[in-house]
């Protein structure tokens, strides 16, 4: 081979290498841009500062279900923001169903803790996910563990005790005479029993769209259960947006 041919071959290799490197660099740049965009979109961002407790009701959604929640009722300050939530924890005074006084002092008089607890109705709203709906739980789960026969309390509610050795031992199902498990019409709660200084607590559950609402209140309140039932209905209705 002539010297001139060797010179041409030698100078040709870098040019071909440079030509191949340009598309590779371009692809790497595009990949970096795409990765940066994906990281920006998916990277978790800290929510904005919570709003003041005395602000107007916040529009929120839980599992797509809309609610209007007064910030003063939100027990967790970081939950006091509009938008999507997985869960909110609320408290309302009973029987007014107003949010607790956000301006009240945090100091409590001796013995006031128990009184404050029983003067409030607690509400938790969560995304239902794969959890069984309350109506299905009543039809398919509770009958496996509850006693067959029901007693009747002086307030007119029927009571079925859960058997010992079951997941719900120490608790009772309490429902009115018109309760129908096939339609969920009527009033039904699951209540723990009082144990010494610890009062029994009742749970009322309802599913709205894909969100579960659980209302907690002292079992002693069931002496006037019709007022409790009406109050729960009014409370849930007040949390729902007006159509």
What are these regions (language model features)?
Residues 1-20:
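N-terminal Lys/Arg-rich, disordered targeting/topogenic segments
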Residues 21-41:
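Hydrophobic membrane-insertion alpha-helices, especially the h-region
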Residues 41-59:
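Ser/Thr/Pro/Gly-rich low-complexity linker/stalk segments immediately outside membranes or between
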Residues 58-62, 204-206:
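Short acidic-hydrophobic surface loop/beta-edge motif
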Residues 68-122:
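Extracytoplasmic/periplasmic/luminal assembly and interaction segments
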Residues 107-196, 200:
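Non-cytosolic head/periplasmic domains of membrane-anchored proteins
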Residues 195-214:
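Extended hydrophobic
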Residues 209-243:
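Surface-exposed amphipathic alpha-helical segments
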């Amino acid at each position: 081979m002539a010297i001139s041919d060797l010179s041409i071959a030698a100078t040709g290799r870098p040019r071909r290498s440079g030509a191949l490197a340009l598309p590779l660099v371009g692809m790497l740049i595009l990949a970096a841009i795409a990765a940066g965009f994906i990281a920006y979109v998916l990277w978790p961002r800290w929510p904005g500062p919570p709003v003041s407790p005395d602000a107007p009701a916040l529009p929120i959604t839980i599992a797509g279900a809309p609610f209007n929640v007064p910030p003063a009722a939100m027990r967790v300050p970081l939950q006091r923001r509009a938008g999507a939530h997985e869960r909110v924890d609320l408290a309302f005074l009973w029987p007014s169903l107003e949010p607790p006084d956000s301006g009240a002092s945090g100091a409590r008089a001796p013995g006031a803790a128990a009184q404050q607890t029983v003067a409030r109705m607690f509400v938790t709203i969560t995304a239902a996910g794969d959890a069984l709906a309350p109506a299905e739980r009543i039809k398919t789960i509770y009958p496996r563990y509850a006693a067959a026969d029901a007693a009747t309390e002086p307030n007119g509610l029927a009571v079925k005790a859960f058997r010992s050795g079951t997941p719900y031992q120490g608790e009772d199902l309490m429902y009115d005479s018109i309760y129908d498990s096939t339609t969920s019409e009527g009033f039904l709660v699951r209540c723990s029993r009082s144990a010494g200084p610890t009062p029994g607590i009742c749970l009322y559950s309802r599913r709205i769209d894909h969100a579960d609402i659980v209302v907690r209140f002292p079992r002693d309140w069931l002496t006037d259960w019709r007022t409790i039932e009406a109050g729960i209905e009014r409370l849930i209705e007040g949390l729902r947006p007006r159509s």
